[in-house]
């Protein structure tokens, strides 16, 4: 009798184990293969910094960004801020941002063609002093109220942290002054957080190389190539962007004190 019970239990165990194994094999889905998406764009930017005295300045950025080369409108950025000079090599800025995003599919009736965002932001820029080259560090925090392109979608709060390190190397002069041609490099990392952020905490990585020229003490132009790497709509999809950037930097100082200390923080 005991042998009979043992046989029954072994049979039930084998049947149950086989059922579980079969169910697991049927429910298992292999992870999707990594997908790479290539895109191109052209970004234009105007950066302004207007000093009212030794400590306070207005800061502004105005960007027009196009996708698919130059073909389609992508974004319009309007960034405003107030800058306080902490020291010769350090600036603190706070302000607001009002960007607008154009939907990639402008013909989809279920999507809004243009969607706004609302942000507040804080930034610390400081320089590492060297004799000839210039090295800058930028720490930027953003609180973003953003929504999708779907009609009627609600705004959600996310947070973003950005760190950028920038290097300027003069080419035709020993130091930076009027009519200096220089190399410009930077690397910037974007990290985001929030309830709606699930897999793409590392939002973007941007690498830039270009040339710049100091037209005068108040005006500078830069042009170069930027490579961007980021998630694109799904955990296994990655977008590689090749972007041409053309930027104009305008600086004015309304403070008339001729004995003020020379500032070493550029427009960023």
Stretches with model-predicted labels:
Residues 38-42, 74-76, 116-120, 155-163, ...:
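Residues that define the transmembrane beta-barrel architecture of outer-membrane proteins
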Residues 46-50, 80-84, 122-128, 163-171, ...:
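Residues on the lipid-exposed face of transmembrane beta-strands in outer-membrane beta-barrel proteins
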Residues 54-55, 89, 129-135, 171-181, ...:
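Short loop/turn motifs that connect adjacent beta-strands in outer-membrane beta-barrel proteins
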Residues 140-222, 228-229:
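Outer-membrane beta-barrel transmembrane domain signature
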Residues 62-68, 96-102, 128-130, 141-145, ...:
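Transmembrane beta-strands of outer-membrane beta-barrel pores
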Residues 58-60, 92-94, 135-139, 161, ...:
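Transmembrane beta-strands of outer-membrane beta-barrel proteins
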Residues 33-41, 66-75, 195-202, 233-240:
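Solvent-exposed loop/turn segments connecting transmembrane beta-strands
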Residues 124, 240-268:
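Outer-membrane beta-barrel "beta-signal"
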């Amino acid at each position: 009798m005991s042998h009979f019970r043992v046989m029954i239990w072994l049979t039930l165990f084998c049947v149950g184990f086989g059922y579980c194994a079969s169910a697991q094999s049927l429910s298992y889905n292999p992870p999707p293969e990594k997908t790479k998406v290539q895109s191109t764009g052209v970004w234009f930017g105007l950066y302004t910094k207007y000093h009212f005295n030794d400590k306070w300045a207005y800061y502004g950025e105005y960007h027009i960004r196009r996708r698919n080369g130059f073909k389609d409108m992508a974004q319009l950025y309007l960034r405003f801020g107030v800058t306080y000079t902490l020291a010769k090599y350090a600036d603190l800025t706070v302000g607001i941002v009002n960007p607008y995003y154009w939907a990639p599919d402008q013909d989809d009736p279920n999507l809004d063609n243009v969607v706004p965002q609302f942000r507040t932001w804080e930034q610390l820029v400081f320089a590492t002093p060297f004799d000839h080259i210039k090295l800058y560090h930028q720490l930027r925090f953003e609180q973003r109220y953003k929504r999708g392109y779907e009609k009627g979608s609600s705004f959600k709060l996310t947070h973003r942290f950005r760190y950028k390190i920038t290097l300027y190397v003069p080419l035709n002069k020993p130091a930076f002054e009027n009519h200096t041609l220089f190399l410009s490099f930077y690397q910037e990392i974007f990290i985001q957080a929030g309830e709606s952020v699930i897999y793409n905490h590392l939002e973007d990585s941007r690498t830039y190389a270009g040339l710049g020229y100091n037209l005068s003490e108040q005006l500078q132009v830069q042009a170069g190539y930027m490579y961007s790497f980021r998630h694109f709509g799904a955990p296994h999809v990655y977008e590689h962007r090749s972007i041409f950037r053309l930027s104009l930097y305008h600086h004015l100082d309304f403070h008339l004190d001729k004995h003020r200390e020379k500032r070493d923080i550029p427009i960023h």
